[in-house]
């Protein structure tokens, strides 16, 4: 197998992952590039248990049984690896947005299975996003998803803090969007408590003092960050036909992730390999019904 997995082209990747055995071998090489290492005792020899759909590797020293998918978004799933890899490859491309209907058609699974796969991936992305605070010169503002100046349906307007890190040359190096609460929604003002909560949670302590506009009606509509939020709203509406408050944060995190990966990864294949590793862990996602679907 090719040694440098992060330099794979799309064509080579499809050729490499042509069946389940090839996908299993690929995942093994990603997990243990220099050969098996027991995650419990670091012993380097194992016997293979091949009676399951995916093999287990039992350490010859401590008898711990290691799985290839543990800690990844594929953990606990009955969906074939080849279908998972196809989904992850599409999501690894920065400008390729998929909804469940489109994914179900691409990998030939039910809508329910496609939705649960995407949900597990988005949940992992969201946790990864929460673990990466903004650094440096951080600026932000209060925006509203679903806002319309003359709309009577205030409950459909979801307040979101939109913030980004600014590089010395003025460009955006990282974007973050987090839902928030307003003490008095009609006033469209972010409270000091919520303002500080965002900073404490999502801005690195080593950063400069963040500048966040707490007053929605004082925002200039030509502001670059405000225009970025409008692009996100269009993406949500055009790709997913609108998102309710229950899952909105996951989709906001996905958009920010897509925006930020251009600074984090050199290629789609590098990101694809990262998707397959436990860094994007889903082991603590407690969704029994979804695990049965995916």
Question: Over which residues does each language-model region extend?
Answer:
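Residue-level recognition of single "structural anchor" positions
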Residues: 1-294
């Amino acid at each position: 197998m090719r040694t440098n997995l992060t330099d794979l082209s799309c064509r080579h990747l499809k050729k490499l992952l042509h069946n389940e055995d090839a996908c299993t071998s690929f995942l093994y090489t990603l997990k243990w590039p220099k050969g098996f290492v027991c995650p419990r005792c670091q012993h380097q020899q194992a016997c293979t248990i091949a009676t399951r759909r995916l093999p287990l590797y039992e350490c010859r020293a401590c008898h711990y049984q290691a799985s290839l998918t543990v800690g990844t978004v594929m953990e606990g799933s009955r969906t074939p690896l080849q279908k998972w890899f196809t989904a992850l490859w599409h999501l690894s491309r920065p400008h390729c947005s998929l909804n469940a209907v489109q994914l179900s058609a691409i990998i030939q699974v039910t809508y329910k299975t496609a939705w649960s796969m995407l949900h597990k991936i988005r949940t992992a992305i969201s946790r990864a996003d929460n673990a990466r605070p903004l650094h440096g010169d951080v600026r932000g503002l209060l925006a509203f998803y679903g806002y319309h100046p003359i709309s009577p349906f205030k409950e459909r307007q979801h307040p979101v803090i939109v913030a980004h890190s600014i590089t010395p040359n003025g460009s955006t190096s990282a974007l973050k969007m987090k839902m928030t609460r307003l003490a008095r929604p009609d006033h469209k003002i972010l409270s000091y408590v919520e303002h500080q909560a965002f900073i404490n949670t999502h801005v690195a302590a080593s950063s400069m003092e963040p500048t966040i506009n707490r007053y929605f009606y004082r925002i200039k509509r030509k502001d670059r960050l405000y225009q970025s939020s409008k692009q996100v709203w269009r993406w949500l509406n055009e790709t997913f036909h609108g998102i309710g408050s229950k899952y909105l944060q996951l989709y906001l995190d996905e958009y920010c992730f897509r925006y930020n990966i251009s600074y984090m990864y050199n290629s789609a294949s590098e990101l694809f390999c990262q998707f397959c590793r436990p860094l994007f862990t889903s082991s603590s996602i407690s969704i029994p019904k979804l695990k049965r679907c995916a």
